[in-house]
């Protein structure tokens, strides 16, 4: 549907473990739906915090939003794994198409049982990731940080670094200098340390797994996993908007038992408004974009008025008007704010 219409919204999905296979009667432990979709669409996931004036970052130095650019293709999300049964040789083999001598590397001489994993990426996908990140940083007028571990991964991670530097020198260096922003590379562990001491205000470009982990850390440090926007920008012109969190399983089970839940729907609301704004841009229907903007404003104003779900209630600035509302009450409060704007 996204490939047909160009824009879509994806709700949270389950990547089943053994318990979920039994619970839902699945045929097997299916692969990650996100990984499958991103493998088809390719591209980069951009995430940014949803800011409200009564919830502040836990990191005191962060005075500007930190954006994440996560490569959405390959690596561990499209891996192949082997459970090694016993002693033997684990090899990495590449067989050229159309003939030629295979390239072989011994990974490990196993003396016992163990595990093996193969991952991959492609130069075109890495290049589109780099181009998307430079474009995003230029559009937002913010610095671009990129981090890998090329001191350890001297071919795999080093290829990412090489392509980013090549893209910067060939297409972006002069533009960045004119805009007063910079491209900065450092190792992933050093980047984490620097981020924690920074004032924010940059796009942090990460490989797939790094971006998966760090985007959740940033969202939580800004108040909640539900306080972050997320959009997959495909090099083929597709846009997939989603909530950056999971299925909120514990809340769902409470709901099934008839208990009242207080679930934060901000990320899902902003997924839909982001989609509507992109649809308005493509269809040249500005009134649709204005409607989406008013929904976002109503959502933020609701939280700032003191009506908020439990996750924000625990981290919001103390105020007598603060009150925890249920899942449905929160949506009703947003609706009331929206109706005032229409």
Please annotate each region the language model reported.
Residues 195-294, 298-305:
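Glycine-rich phosphate/nucleotide-binding loop
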Residues 1-102, 209-213:
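N-terminal glycine-rich phosphate/adenylate-binding segment common to multiple enzyme folds
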Residues 154-165, 195-203, 209, 219, ...:
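Short glycine/threonine-rich loop-to-helix capping motif typified by GTGT followed
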Residues 186-193:
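Short acidic loop-to-helix transition motifs that present clustered carboxylates
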Residues 92-186:
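Glycine-rich phosphate/diphosphate-binding loop of Rossmann-like nucleotide-binding domains
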Residues 139-148, 172-185, 280-292, 302-315:
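Flexible, glycine/charged-enriched surface loops at secondary-structure junctions
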Residues 72-74, 78-130, 285, 293-342:
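Glycine-rich phosphate/pyrophosphate-binding loop and the adjoining helix
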């Amino acid at each position: 549907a996204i490939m047909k219409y160009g824009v879509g919204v994806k709700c949270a999905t389950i990547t089943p473990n053994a318990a979920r296979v039994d619970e839902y009667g699945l045929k097997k432990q299916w692969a990650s739906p996100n990984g499958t979709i991103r493998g088809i669409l390719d591209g980069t996931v951009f995430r940014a915090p949803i800011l409200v004036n009564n919830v502040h970052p836990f990191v005191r130095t962060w005075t500007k939003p930190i954006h994440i650019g996560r490569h959405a293709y390959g690596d561990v999300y499209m891996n192949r794994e082997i459970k090694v049964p016993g002693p033997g040789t684990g090899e990495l083999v590449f067989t050229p198409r159309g003939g030629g001598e295979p390239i072989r590397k011994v990974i490990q001489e196993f003396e016992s049982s163990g595990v093996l994993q193969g991952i991959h990426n492609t130069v075109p996908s890495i290049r589109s990731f780099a181009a998307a990140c430079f474009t995003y940083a230029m559009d937002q007028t913010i610095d671009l940080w990129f981090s890998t571990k090329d001191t350890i991964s001297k071919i795999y991670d080093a290829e990412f670094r090489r392509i980013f530097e090549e893209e910067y020198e060939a297409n972006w260096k002069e533009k960045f200098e004119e805009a007063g922003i910079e491209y900065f590379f450092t190792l992933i562990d050093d980047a984490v340390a620097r981020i924690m001491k920074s004032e924010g205000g940059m796009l942090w470009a990460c490989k797939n797994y790094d971006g998966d982990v760090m985007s959740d850390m940033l969202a939580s440090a800004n108040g909640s996993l539900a306080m972050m926007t997320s959009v997959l920008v495909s090099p083929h012109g597709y846009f997939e908007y989603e909530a950056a969190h999971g299925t909120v399983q514990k809340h769902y089970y409470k709901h099934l038992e008839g208990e009242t839940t207080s679930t934060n729907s901000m990320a899902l609301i902003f997924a839909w408004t982001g989609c509507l704004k992109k649809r308005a841009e493509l269809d040249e229907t500005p009134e649709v974009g204005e409607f989406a903007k008013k929904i976002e404003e109503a959502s933020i104003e609701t939280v700032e008025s003191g009506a908020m779900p439990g996750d924000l209630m625990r981290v919001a600035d103390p105020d007598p008007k603060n009150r925890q509302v249920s899942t449905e009450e929160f949506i009703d409060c947003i609706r009331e704010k929206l109706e005032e704007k229409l």
